[in-house]
Amino acid sequence: MRIQIEKDQLGWVAGLLDSCGNIMFSKTHVSGNIEIKLKLTDYECLENMKTKYGGAVKVSRTGTRYRLNHSEGLKKLLEDINGQIRIPVRVKKVKEVCEKNNIEIKYPDKELSLDTAWLSGFFDGVGSIVINQTTLENKKQLVLTFNQKNNQILIKIQRIVGGNFYINTNTQSGKYKYALYFTSKEEILQLYEYFKKYPSRAYKNKRIGLIPQYYELQTLMTSIHDNQLQETLWKKFMIQWDYKEIDEIQSGEILKQKGVIR
């Protein structure tokens, strides 16, 4: 379903570009070329970008790519995100492309805020929401995560919404990857309230919408002592939750029928 990007949601565009966007220059596109890559299931999400700014959406079996390089749409997008880009490497690139398009660069406030849609767009690019099966009392743990190669922006996110850090080190390259993750019910519900105001536009929004139902089911389980009934209730819930394999296959089939991929 196509959802119009309203003025108060423009921070989402900046957050998405910060998380998984790329700004390039070439001989054929001297004014700049913006590219954003998402999963196959997020085809409609990038079609929303195309509707607002023009450009093109290309789908392959591995994902969906949005590319914008025509002058009018590029300038409109730059005006919308100007002053909201936060990742240093992106700020540098936006400064370059603004200069080439005669746009005065603006810089964001030092501290992040929950009063913009930036965090929603950033989550759509690098976030995940899963239920992990733990060995402790066979518990099913809801986990919401932001992943990044650099921890600077994650520290700023932690200041406003909490969470805990996990550092993954690649033993071969010695490089670090950082994850800011949330398991606390209070913190996750705070994020849920934020997403109600500034919705995720990626397919993972389906899971975000199920957060209250997850906690209701967790509470219900404490009063049910029939293991078979518990298993039945969880299976029914997980049919709604586990869209990944089923819906990625279905999305692929639908896009084939539309002639988007072959």
UniProtKB/Swiss-Prot annotation:
Enzyme Commission number(s) of this protein: 3.1.-.-
Gene3D superfamilies listed in its UniProt record: Homing endonucleases
Function in brief: Mitochondrial DNA endonuclease involved in intron homing.
Protein name: Intron-encoded DNA endonuclease ai2b
Superkingdom of the source species: Eukaryota
Family in the record: Belongs to the LAGLIDADG endonuclease family.
GO CC annotation, single: mitochondrion
